[in-house]
Regions:
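Class I SAM-dependent transferase core
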Residues: 48-52, 62-108
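N-terminal auxiliary segments of SAM/dcSAM-dependent transferases
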Residues: 2-70
Length: 211
């Protein structure tokens, strides 16, 4: 029934007043359902029974293994594969990349000399930024993409950065043998499913974790 209604609406065959009424009622029913404690528990239990992430191979094929040259054409100079920060004085994408990473540093209280894990590092914008800014830090960059890790290795070699350590890992079989002072993960958690197992793994590796 709903699919037939959508079919009619997409073809402009449903009066706007009726469409608005349906959307309002449907939204209210979903909100009521979402507030149910049983529903919340069911969702959490379902997430906790699954893997940390699903379809990681498909995700790679869809966009993570797209050649770096493509992203160089559409992203900023640091290939920041996540949100940037435009304030009133920021006029370019390159500046917005830096502004956002400065905010990460402030909020995570990152300092020189720390050991840092960048989980889901993308094309290495933050990892490389940290390695350049803090020469006494050791930055471990983890991605599921061979192309991304290869790109980071190439940039690190060009800039003679010895304190950055990129490696390919699937988050479902994450192997972390070091302790980290900071674990940063930028816009990766929306791709995760079993948050509990992931956070348990990360808390084990960090002696003083921060939110």
């Amino acid at each position: 029934m709903i699919s037939f209604g959508i079919y009619l609406a997409e073809r402009g065959l449903v009066p706007e007043s009726l469409l608005r009424l349906f959307i309002k009622q449907f939204s209210l029913s979903r909100l009521t359902e979402a507030k149910s404690e049983d529903k919340k528990k069911s969702v959490i239990d379902g997430l906790n029974r699954g893997p940390i992430a699903e379809n990681t191979i498909d995700a790679n094929e869809q966009h993570y293994e797209v050649p770096a040259d493509y992203f160089k054409a559409v992203l900023g100079p640091r290939l920041k594969y996540s949100c940037c920060l435009f304030d009133e004085e920021t006029t370019t994408l390159g500046e917005a990349e830096i502004e956002m990473m400065e905010l990460y540093l402030e909020r995570a209280q990152i300092e020189d000399g720390q050991t840092i894990l960048d989980l889901g590092c993308g094309w290495g914008s933050l990892s490389l930024f940290l390695a350049e800014r803090f020469p006494n830090c050791n930055v471990y960059s983890v991605s599921n993409s061979k192309d991304q890790i290869e790109h980071i290795e190439n940039i690190a070699k060009e800039k003679n950065l010895k304190n950055i350590h990129p490696e390919v890992q699937d988050v479902n079989s994450l192997s972390l043998e070091k302790e980290f002072d900071r674990v940063v993960s930028i816009e990766m958690f929306e791709h995760m499913r079993n948050y509990k197992d992931l956070l348990d793994c990360l808390l084990y590796t960090s002696p003083s974790p921060r939110d």
